[in-house]
Every structure is written in C-alpha cells, then in structure tokens.
Amino acid sequence: MGQGDESERIVINVGGTRHQTYRSTLRTLPGTRLAWLAEPDAHSHFDYDPRADEFFFDRHPGVFAHILNYYRTGKLHCPADVCGPLYEEELAFWGIDETDVEPCCWMTYRQHRDAEEALDSFGGAPLDNSADDADADGPGDSGDGEDELEMTKRLALSDSPDGRPGGFWRRWQPRIWALFEDPYSSRYARYVAFASLFFILVSITTFCLETHERFNPIVNKTEIENVRNGTQVRYYREAETEAFLTYIEGVCVVWFTFEFLMRVVFCPNKVEFIKNSLNIIDFVAILPFYLEVGLSGLSSKAAKDVLGFLRVVRFVRILRIFKLTRHFVGLRVLGHTLRASTNEFLLLIIFLALGVLIFATMIYYAERIGAQPNDPSASEHTHFKNIPIGFWWAVVTMTTLGYGDMYPQTWSGMLVGALCALAGVLTIAMPVPVIVNNFGMYYSLAMAKQKLPKKKKKHIPRPPQLGSPNYCKSVVNSPHHSTQSDTCPLAQEEILEINRADSKLNGEVAKAALANEDCPHIDQALTPDEGLPFTRSGTRERYGPCFLLSTGEYACPPGGGMRKDLCKESPVIAKYMPTEAVRVT
C-alpha cells in the first residue's frame, strides 16, 4: 500500500474501541464533528495521541459504529439495543441531523419520544412513587419540597431579608395545595384523599337510593289557591324523598364545598384551575343543592318551576364519579387512552357510518322484493318501511347486538343481514387493536413511573464565597491521573471575562475551532510549565489545552495547568491553585 494511502487513514478511539477509516470518508458529511477530524489542524483542536496516532472521544462506542457506517453508506440506521435519548444525544454530539434516520428505523427512533410524551402527560405526582411517609411531620412534607426550600435558603431567594422563608403564603400555599390535590404527597394528603373518596361514594349511593320507591313514600298534600271569588283548597299526592337522605347529601355537599374552596384559594394558577374539566364538574355538582335549599321555602310559581328543574338536573351529581380519577391510576390511564386514540375513534365512526348508510339502503330495497301488488309500501310483510328506520337496524347488526325488534323476512333481506353482520365484525375489529395498544402502553408507563424508587434527597453544597478558588468552578480532589471529575456550570459572563484577559495577555483573541456555544474553547498561550502534556493515564499523553471538554476529563501536570495571570484579572479564579481536572459544560 502506498504512502498516500497510509496518510489518508485515520484512527478514532471511541470509548476504548478503535475505529479505522479514511479521511475522504469523513469528508462526505461536511460540517459535522467527524468531518473536522479530516482537517489538517485537527491535531491541535481534538484529543490526539501522537504515540498511538489516534483521536480519542469518550463517547458510546456502539452508537459510534452506526454513525461511522452512515459516513460509509449514506444510510443512518438506529440500533434497537440503545435507548432513544442516548442515541439522540450521540447524534447531537457528532453533529448529525436526526431527520437523516432511515424510514425503516424512524419508528424505533421515535419510541422514546412517544414514551416521554406519555410520561409527561401524567405529569402530576399521583403517579410518582414515594415511600410511606411514616415520619412525616406535616402536610406536604416531601423530599422535593424540603430540597426546594433548602435550595431557596442557600441561594438567598427568600423575600425576607434575614433569610427566612418569605411569609406564611409562600411557606404553606404549596403544602396545602398538595394536601388537597396530590394524594401521594404526604401522609395527611392520603387521609384527605380517603375522606374525599368516602364522601364521593356516599353521595353516589344516596343519589341512587333517592330513586327507589322505598325511600320515596307517597304523601297527601294540601294547597290553597286564590281564585276570583275566594280561595280554593286543592288536594294532591306527591312522592317525597326521605329526609335523612337529604341530610346525608347535605353533609357530603358541605365537604365538597370546603374541598373546592380550599383548592380554589391555594391553587397556584387560577386560570388553569378554571379550565380543568374536573373542577367544572365539582362546581356544577355543588351548585344545584344550594339553589334547591334556597328556593325550597318559596311558594311562588316561578320558584316551584325552578325547583322542578333543579330536581331534574340532579343527575349531574353522578358526575362526581370522575373525581375518582385523582385517586386511581387505571381511570387516568383510560382517560389518556381515549384522548390518544381520538383518530382511531373517528376512523371507527366513519367506517360505521359508511356501513350503516350502505346496508340500510340495501335492506330497504331487498325487503321490498316480493311485496304484494296491493301493498305498495310493503308494510304488511316487512319492518323496513323506509331507509331511516333501516339505520337503527344496521347499527344494531354491525355492532353485533341484535335486539330482535327488527329483522328481515325475505331471502334477499337475510342475505343483506348476513353481509351486514360480517362487515360490522371486520370494521370494528380493525381500529380496536390500536386502542388496546395505546391503553397497554399508557398503563405500563404509569405502572413503571409509579414503581420508580423514591429518589434520595440531593446534597446541596454550600455556595463558595466570592474570592474562593472554588467560586463557579469545579476542582476535583481525585488522585493524580484520575479520569473522573465532577462538573460545575460556568457562567457565560465569566467565560467572556477569561477570553478578554487572555486577549490582553497574549495579544490576540482566543479562537474557537468549532462553532459550538455549548462547549466553549479557550485557546491561549501557555507557559513552559503549562506546556507539559496533558495526561489521562500513565501511558497516554495529550498535547494542547482541553478543547472538547465533553469528550473526557483531563488531568493537569503537577506544575499547575491554570494560568496564574487569569486569576488576577478574572473573578472566577481568585488565586493560583494546582488542579487535577477542570471540566466546563
């Protein structure tokens, strides 16, 4: 093999796995990270090992094999054994557009997003698993709430000048809201949820018993009416509900009113609260009771008409059953499934509508065959006197109910009926599996989210003081040549300050080889001590400053890898301090 071919070869070490290809292969996708490796000055901008003559990237080696194959074949496939977010992150790192994924793998690639959207749709904490709060001290005592409160104190975000939480409202509003809205937030929230569930069941039971004749005795009533010449006594009989059922319903309404008012007052977003359908149901179910109580003492005709109307609309109380969705995951899953399967339901309705129209018309004309000459409407030997009546028969037949109130009586009508039944079975069976799959997906995701182990409280470190060497940077106290480091986000203003100081000291502005705002590059001249090779381990040397900070962590030489001059100019680093690894994200 000629020397030119050898110079065209390039070795890329990704996560310990060495990959070999040609520079011309990497140039097939200009503007990507691998295409920049083919540039002549790539050695100074990337993690290059001159001894092994290879570039090193601390990324996923399995995904990189598919990405490199994309440069070779021009087709990007998605591995089935890699989680979607990981593959998406790798594509973003290597600078490849996700729309380049082949159609055969697009659904596999999209699965993680569908799962994330499904998990986000559950959103609230009722599906968040949390351990039994046996040691909970009060409502809303959750780990996340304490972490947020601690973070507020640490970051001095409190309204009070002395660092205390900003008043009663700020302290108790989220706790009381979680107490009535999130049954899984604390032990006391569970008690409130059990009480609400009890009153819901009692209210629905009372509503059903009020319609039973045992609890609606017939009573004789007398009414005096004014007539022209005097008064007239009218006697009539009326069914009257037992008083104890009304009292029970009143107690339930008092609880629902208290619960509704507490949720309204302590709701963090009043507009979203009003738009919530469950909250509208709560209000509509409560209002008729108070109107009925307020108008019961009036004897005017208008008041009686309103009372009669309110007694009719008592059925809205049954809508309280939907409040159970706050307490049962399965009901919430069903609701999400119905919303996610809207297109399938519309498709099912369209199929049924077409079938109903076709078979209702066919059965009408099929039953008219053989009609007697003296019976032009064929009403004597068939039930299908017109096409609209056939709509009912077609719906009942296609859904395989078959009430038997209408049926064909001629051989041609029986043939149409058989075809209608078969078409109904096939039509309904097509969209149903999609709906069932949606339910299974939502239910499995809900169960997985509910069974997630409770996250431990995060350690919130004390913020370093101004002037401290650790101010807005991370110094890893690990042994020399360690490859592990913690990260600390660096403010953009501080990066600009470093660039300005570097420009003043070296007489030129630091240039970035990659236009990547998420990975800032500081290209600066180094002192002789700082010019020592960066090392990852005892056997690997790296020359040049850290450029791709996300490809790995770097260990600086014992002489110090951080400019002392910058410490004087920038508030980020107040004094010179030997560091083993500094990582900027």
From Swiss-Prot:
Residues 130-147 have a biased composition (Acidic residues). One of its GO terms (biological process) is action potential. N-glycosylated; contains sialylated glycans. Pfam families: BTB_2 (PF02214), Ion_trans (PF00520). Changing residue 229 to Q: Reduces extent of N-glycosylation. Abolishes N-glycosylation. A motif (Selectivity filter) lies at residues 400-405. This is Voltage-gated potassium channel KCNC1. It comes from Rattus norvegicus (Rat).
